[in-house]
């Protein structure tokens, strides 16, 4: 079963203090399926000269969107996978996988990294509707993390890059350790986990986790 980003389903005009009174120490947990971020040059190579990323739907993080462009095929030593492209374009190509995805592709030693940290990571082939490219690096397992604004961080008593635990209650209640908090004015409060983590915790549908400091 393929998962997608779960869009935010909350009222954004609720005052932050009221929101934390209602949802004390709670954070929305969103599951992020495998996907790629592309540079402008990669978009042209895969989709053709003059091609652009087309907005299909906006995601929970401001300015980020799922695209309506055809999926790209990732080609690894042992297998292939179709992946969605997220926008906007970036300065470096990035392939975000789960451990299961990496095994299907036959990629070894894919590191757990924060988004944007792609130095010394495996590369692979990408095949689009028009062309294909081979990237030297870019494949990562995304480190589980929480996006939050400075106001959110202040309310929680959390600093940028702080590591916390998050408890998700379900039929398979799980406490995730080593969750990095990423603080920026342009973020919206949400925790992101991958599909392996989602399945392990039974975190299906609209799910909230409890932040443990």
Regions found by a protein language model. Give the residues of each.
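Short intrinsically disordered, low-complexity coil segments enriched in acidic
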Residues: 1-4, 163
């Amino acid at each position: 079963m393929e998962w997608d980003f779960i869009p935010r389903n909350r009222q954004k005009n609720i005052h932050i203090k009221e929101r934390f009174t209602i949802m004390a120490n709670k954070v929305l947990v969103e599951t992020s399926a495998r996907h790629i971020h592309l540079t402008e040059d990669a978009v042209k190579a895969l989709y053709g000269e003059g091609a652009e990323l087309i907005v299909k739907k906006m995601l929970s993080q401001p300015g980020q969107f799922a695209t309506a462009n055809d999926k790209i095929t990732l080609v690894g030593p042992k297998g292939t996978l179709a992946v969605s492209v997220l926008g906007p374009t970036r300065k470096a190509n990035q392939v975000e996988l789960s451990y299961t995805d990496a095994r299907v592709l036959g990629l070894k030693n894919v590191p757990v990294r924060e988004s944007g940290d792609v130095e010394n990571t495996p590369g692979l082939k990408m095949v689009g509707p028009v062309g294909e490219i081979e990237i030297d690096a870019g494949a990562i397992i995304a480190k589980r993390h929480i996006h939050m604004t400075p106001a959110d961080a202040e309310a929680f008593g959390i600093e940028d890059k702080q590591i916390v635990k998050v408890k998700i209650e379900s039929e398979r209640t799980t406490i995730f350790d080593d969750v990095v908090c990423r603080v920026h004015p342009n973020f919206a409060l949400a925790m992101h986990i991958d599909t392996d983590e989602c399945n392990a915790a039974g975190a299906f549908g609209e799910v909230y986790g409890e932040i443990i400091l």
